[in-house]
Amino acid sequence: MRPIRLVAAALSLTFAGPSFGWIEYQSQADHFSINFPDEPEVRDIEYLTEQFLTLPARLYSYEDGPSRYSMTVVDFSNTEQMHAERLANCEAELGGGDSCNNPWSTELRGAMVHAAWNLMQRAAQVTHFSYYFSDLVEGQRLHLTNADGSRTYAAIHMHENLLYIMEGTVPAGAPEPALFQQSLGFIDEAGDRIRYRSIYTNGFPPPPSFTYQ
């Protein structure tokens, strides 16, 4: 993945009750912006795909008492080449046929579904699962009730072959983490936020867009 450069800007937010300071956090390496309670921890990790590729990924996370916030970004840009290398000897070993077809396009198109499936396998009850979009980048949204009564609010998107998995978990009885949930944006190389004029679907030509700061 690309070298990481990060930008964080302070937000001043007021509630009916205590006042909390959040930041608008940007990762120019992974082309997104999102609100966190404070600077998140960033770790390089690995991600196993549905077709058993191990891809480079990055985990951005922050714990605020019993509440947890995270963004996982997985780089799918080299999946075609990686599958081709894995199938290099397929015809000689298996004699060709469907077993030797490169599944990279299926891998890309199914990435969000597989990520949602992984969330559903947790020891939690799924209470909501729907189509969703953020800044007109399409995705999926899930709500889960965990064994301890806490609630996880997750959203999954794919933009320019990067898979984004965001999760906000709050204690039982706490309100939804709206400041986190509703803040996701996608940014260009200059750090400007991209806004599409119609729905963006990964793998298809992007619709017209404009940028703003």
Task: Please report, for each region that a protein language model flagged, where it lies by residue.
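A mature extracytoplasmic/lumenal domain signature
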Residues: 29, 38-40, 46, 75, ...
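Short N-terminal segments immediately surrounding and downstream of signal-peptide cleavage
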Residues: 21-39
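Bacterial N-terminal signal peptides that target proteins for export
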Residues: 1-8
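Short, solvent-exposed coil/turn segments at beta-strand boundaries
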Residues: 35-39, 64-67, 136-137, 157-164, ...
